[in-house]
Amino acid sequence: LKVKGKKNIAFAELPSVTENGMSSLFGCAEVEDVAQTRYSNLKTVIPDVEIIQLERLNSGVTANKLVLMFGDIDQVGEKKQLAGLKDINAYEAFVSEKINDLFSMGYGKVYLTADHGFVITGILDEADKIPVPDGDIIKSEERFCLANDTLGNENIIVRSQKYKESQYQYYAKSDKPFVSKGAYGYAHGGFTPQECIIPSYEFANENQESLGVFIVNKSALLNVTGTYFTVKPVSYTHLTLPT
């Protein structure tokens, strides 16, 4: 197996949070909080796409177009904060293994991206956190605030862009979080390059000259009679012949 990779980048939607980034990746016109709604939207654009969790990938998957979801890195970061960093190498190895599995199954190209990145804020004292700006603040999160008016504050970045019910977004100029509830250490939603620059990687199998066929029900062929078969080309390699 000889794999060639192209490392490109893209910009995440802002705020760099899951529901916003995923809605964009799945082609939604508006921000959709429910994952199944996002999946349904993609299927209206690409009817033959199959969307499954990465850990469910196996040789029985025969979708022509396949989207694999893997959210463990984000979930571990949210739960364990800094302690979750030690798990990332294992997750990277797992994803790499699954990419090789896809090529072994006959897929010619694999694209890897993410809904957002993250920033490591470290363990902070309360004095290190940024006060929430004064004004008509609709929602305040660790890495951004939403409002319906402009604020004259030189210490924050103001973005005039509608997001859900708000008209303005406010971001810290550093990796420090706004004062908010919850644990600190791992965060996303903000404006730093670590949060809003995402991978757009392409991997291709250079050894794939022709697609192989893996027949899983060979015993059923013993009951098939006749001289000629009509073969239709398929774009996947795992083929189950009818019984």
List where the protein language model places each region.
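Short loop/turn segments at strand-loop or loop-helix junctions that form parts
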Residues: 67-75
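Short secondary-structure boundary/capping segments
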Residues: 2, 80-86, 120-137
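Flexible loop/turn segments at secondary-structure boundaries
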Residues: 1, 74-78, 118-121, 207-208
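Active-site nucleophile/metal-coordination loop of metallo-enzymes that catalyze phosphate/sulfate
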Residues: 2-60, 160, 165-166, 176
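A long, amphipathic alpha-helix that forms part
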Residues: 78-110
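Metal-dependent active-site segment of extracytoplasmic phospho-/sulfohydrolases and closely related
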Residues: 99-128
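Active-site neighborhoods of enzymes that stabilize oxyanions during catalysis
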Residues: 127-129, 134-232
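Conserved small/polar residues in nucleotide/adenosyl-binding loops
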Residues: 237-242
